[in-house]
Amino acid sequence: GADSYLAAIYGPHVTVTDLYNSRKVVIGADSIATKQWLSVINDEGFPYAAAGPRLGTVRNATVDWKIGDESNEARQFNDASMNMLVYEARQKYYYFNTQNTLQLANSAFRNIGAVLNVLNIKETLARKLKDYIQLPISDDLVEAVTRTISDYMDGCKSGNRVSDYALNNETTKTDVSNNELHFMLTLAPAYYAQKIYLVVNVVNAAFDFQILQSL
């Protein structure tokens, strides 16, 4: 079927130029669409998914599941890019579950937003650093690479996309002899809201709301 993993074999293909190896290659049209999609992401940032890869469809799922479990229901909700509004009857409050990865333990990659953010940072820096390929290795080149990464990450930090970061030059003489520069970028993704609590308190129409303001 068109939705199977074999569809790409029989679908339309196009011939493109592989600039890195000076050759022509035949690829699926979906790869062209993916490249364009990545270009939009790099230029505009990640858009909000309208309905997810499953078009928002969740079948035979219950709502009594815990974030981070390995159940089929949890996978369906995450795959469909759906957020859940949950009512906790015992505590009498609502909370809004945002999308999470299926990791059981808390980590930097616990939230889908953090994962997409880090992927976007990696793709953007790769595109920016491509301009320095084939330039002579020198102190000026190292400084230019460092400045490019730092300027971009400073923007990410001021925009609250990361909590903090550190950049280290780990290039050795052996690396230089192999025509390589090595840098280590350590970053802490920003915190993403995973639950938003809302308590609905119903009062009489004659209630004096100034009492709440004084609390």
Predicted regions and their residues:
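A glycine- and small-residue-enriched flexible loop/hinge signal that marks low-structured segments
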Residues: 1-136, 145, 152, 157-170
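Surface-exposed ligand/attachment interfaces on beta-rich extracellular proteins
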Residues: 139-141
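Compositionally biased, low-complexity/repeat regions
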Residues: 147, 162-215
